[in-house]
C-alpha cells in the first residue's frame, strides 16, 4: 500500500512539474491579444474585400475560421470590441453565405454560418439564423450527401449542422451530418478518405495510393488532418452523448490524436507532411495550432490522457506562442492556402501568407483551450 501511495505521489508530482510548463492564464491572454490586435488594426473594416491574386468577399472560409477563433477568445476575454467587430461582419454580409448565395452547397462558402449561429445564440435576432438555416435545410431536402469531397470540408461545414441541431432542438441536423461524414469517411474516392491502417486522413481522392510522398509513404497533410481533429472536437462539445454516432466521432477523434503524437517534432511543431519529414519539413503554425487545439480540448474534457498528451500540447503551444508569434503580433511560419505539403512554400518566420486570417483563427482556438488548461 505504501508503495502504491508513493507511485501515485510521484506520478502526481510529474504531472505538476509538466503543468508548470503551461503559461499562466494572464500570459495566454496577452499572447492572444497581441496576435488578434495586430490583425484588427490591420483590418479595421471587417467587410473590406480581400485582394490577393483576385478580389474576394470578406466572409470566405479563411475569414470564417478567424471568426471561429475570435468567438472562442471572446468567451475568455469578454471585450465588447470583439463582439462588435463580429456583428458588423455578419450584418454587412446580411448574415448570408459567401457572395449572398443562400443555396450554395460548397462547404467553404458555408463556413461563415458557424459564427452567425454563435452570434444568434448571444442575441437571437431571426435574421442572424435565417439564411444559414435555409442553406442547410436545402442541403438536407436535396437528399444528396456527397458534397464533402475533401477533408477541409469536415471542419468548414460539419459543426454548422451540430450547432443548428442544438440551437433548434432538431435531430434531423445530426442525422444528416452523419450521412455526409459517413460518405467522406467510408465512400469518397472509392473507399473513403480515412485510412484505418494509420488512423490519418488523405486530403482528397487525388492523394489515395498509389500516390505517395518522395519517401514512399502515404501523403498526410498536417493542416488537413488538423481540420478534421478540430471539427470532431467542435462536434463532440455540442452533440448529445445519446446520439447514435457520438461514440464513433469520439473514437475517430481519439485515434487521430493518438496517431499524431509520435509525429510531433522535437521543437514542438508538426511538419506539413506528417509521414515524410524531409518533404518540405520544418516549422508550421496552422497545422500545429489545430493539433494543439484538439488535443488540449481532449484533455480538458477527459477524452485524452493528460499523462500522454500534456507534454505534446505544452511543447506545441510554447512553439507557436514563442516562435511563431512575433513581438508585434504577427504570426510566422503559416503555410499559405493550398491542399498539400508543397503548397505555399517556403514557410518562414517572416513570410506573410496569402491570407493572414485562418492561421490566427487556429491560434486563437488553441490558445483558448490552453487558457482553460492553465491553473492560474
Model-inferred region functions:
Residues 1-23:
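Bacterial Sec-dependent N-terminal signal peptides
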Residues 11, 22-64, 73-86, 92, ...:
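CBM-like carbohydrate-recognition segments
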Residues 34-38, 145-146, 204, 208-209, ...:
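Surface loop/turn signatures of beta-propeller and other carbohydrate-active proteins
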Residues 44, 78, 94-99, 124, ...:
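Helix-capping and short linker residues that terminate individual alpha-solenoid repeat units
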Residues 128-161:
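Asp-box/WD-like beta-propeller blade repeats and closely related beta-sheet repeat scaffolds
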Residues 151-152, 162-274, 281-292, 304-338, ...:
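Extended ligand-binding clefts on enzyme/binding-domain cores
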